[in-house]
Amino acid sequence: KRKSSMHVGLKLVKDKKADGFFTAGNSGAAMAVSMVILGLLDGVTRPAIGTILPCSNKRGHFFMLDVGANVDCRPEHIVTFAIMGSAYAKKVLHINNPSVGLLSNGEEEGKGDMLTKTVYPILKETNAINFVGNVEGKALFKGEADVVVCDGFAGNIALKVSQSVAKYITSVLKEELLS
């Protein structure tokens, strides 16, 4: 819909009348409208949703993508996400040589599902990034990597679980402090 807030907001970005766009709307719709209005960068075949999450390293945060745009990915999508995430970390988060990790169920090179096992050696040979290997879920919030890449299925689960745990801990602390 041409008069929807998403369409209007993204058109303002395209016309350089706005620097960015935030929405509380459906992420799938936001992606679709973004692709139609803004298009994709050269070499990018799939957009990704990224988010900044807190961690215990000296920076206090890391960037994770994809957290929900693409539930099924091919290895080249993950490589593109790694390059985009690294560029974002450099330009926006001001990290000179951001480390890039691949979300997996173990830190060893041979761990993971078929996608993870297939993309690992490709990321290892990608000169455009500082690949540091697999990052396990238990290590995410330690900040072992400045950028963590995965498909949108795994990323969305990791994001939603972390949000749920944060809400749970907050409610328990609030209950204990107020009782």
Predicted region positions:
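N-terminal glycine-rich phosphate/adenylate-binding segment common to multiple enzyme folds
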Residues: 1-48
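Structural motif
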Residues: 4, 11, 18-21, 28-29, ...
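A generic local secondary-structure boundary/capping motif
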Residues: 11, 38, 50-55, 69, ...
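Short acidic, glycine/serine/threonine-rich loops at helix termini
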Residues: 32-37, 76-77, 112-116, 159-162
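Glycine-rich phosphate/nucleotide-binding loop
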Residues: 35-60, 64, 144-179
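Short glycine-rich anion-binding loops that position phosphate/pyrophosphate groups of nucleotides
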Residues: 26-29, 36, 107-108, 153-156
